[in-house]
């Protein structure tokens, strides 16, 4: 007697290739487990990139320009001082990031699901590496960010990492521009620094030791000093760390493909964007090609909300 409910029928490689939206969902699930770019920037809207570019303004001082005058005591019937401000409108172009991976006719014929899933995983990994590297490079290239050295290498167990981070937080707060350094800021590190944080004696002494979610027990670093999170990536140098207020530092907006282009997309929701997928035939040899793409425009709008810590 059959059990109820019956198991779902196994799907074949050939059937998957006819469902590009499902491939898009798989890629989104794999990409956004590791990609940090959506955590660095505030997500914009498709309307912001209509026409292939996003217009933005770099943050100004919260005060008026002092020339020709500032607030002052004014005598009766005397002229009042006047101060204005300047605005500069900039444009960030939409970039087309994409890659294709072939699925051979033999893999389809033999239903080699392992080859198909490896192709998906490798495509997702390449998208993550490329997009995150571009985002980090954009942050570091902005002349308006602040750079400060670490007190000592974070590879040394006794280095006061908390002091280095809080100094960077104070730098952000000290801009007096409404940035949050001590509440919800994001710390970005190379993945090799995870082990150094776990071994750091200053952090061990400061963080709870008896809790079930304690970092040495779980292997997951708990945020400290008011941080909203710690993001680990291979896209930043091992001797660098970035602290930023992700709610204002920059904006990333995505241009959707035109329906006539034949791409399919699965919307993952939240701050994430769809990885658009197109499957088409290649006759020499008789392969199927999976193309995955994303069209972002990224702008650093508040470089004062970013601090680069060197020598970690």
Language-model features, listed with the residues they occupy:
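Extended, solvent-exposed, turn-rich assembly/linker loops in the middle of proteins
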Residues: 144-219
């Amino acid at each position: 007697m059959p059990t109820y409910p019956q198991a779902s029928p196994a799907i074949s490689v050939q059937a998957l290739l006819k469902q590009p939206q499902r491939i898009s969902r798989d890629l989104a699930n794999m990409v956004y487990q590791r990609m940090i770019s959506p955590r660095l920037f505030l997500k914009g809207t498709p309307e912001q990139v209509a026409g292939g570019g996003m217009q933005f303004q770099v943050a100004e001082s919260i005060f008026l320009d002092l020339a020709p005058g500032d607030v002052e005591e004014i005598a009766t019937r005397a002229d009042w001082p006047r101060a204005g401000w300047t605005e500069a409108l900039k444009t960030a172009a939409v970039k087309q990031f994409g890659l294709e991976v072939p699925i051979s006719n033999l893999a389809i014929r033999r239903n080699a699901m392992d080859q198909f899933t490896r192709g998906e995983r490798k495509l997702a990994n390449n998208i993550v590496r490329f997009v995150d590297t571009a985002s980090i490079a954009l942050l570091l290239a902005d002349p308006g960010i602040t750079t400060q050295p670490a007190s000592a290498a974070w590879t040394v167990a006794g280095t006061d990492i908390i002091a280095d981070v809080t100094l960077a937080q104070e730098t952000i707060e000290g801009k007096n521009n409404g940035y949050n350094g001590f509440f919800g800021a994001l710390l970005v590190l190379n993945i090799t620094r995870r082990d150094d944080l776990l071994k750091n004696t200053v952090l061990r002494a400061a963080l709870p030791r008896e809790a079930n979610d304690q970092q040495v027990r779980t292997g997951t670093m708990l945020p400290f000093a008011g941080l909203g999170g710690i993001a680990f990536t291979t896209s930043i140098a091992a001797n660098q760390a970035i602290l930023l207020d992700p709610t204002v530092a920059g904006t990333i907006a995505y241009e959707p493909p035109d329906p006539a282009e034949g791409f399919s997309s699965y919307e993952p929701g939240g701050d994430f964007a769809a990885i658009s997928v197109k499957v088409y035939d290649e006759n020499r040899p008789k392969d199927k090609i999976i193309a995955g793409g994303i069209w972002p425009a990224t702008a650093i709008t508040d470089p004062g909300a970013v601090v680069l810590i060197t020598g970690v």
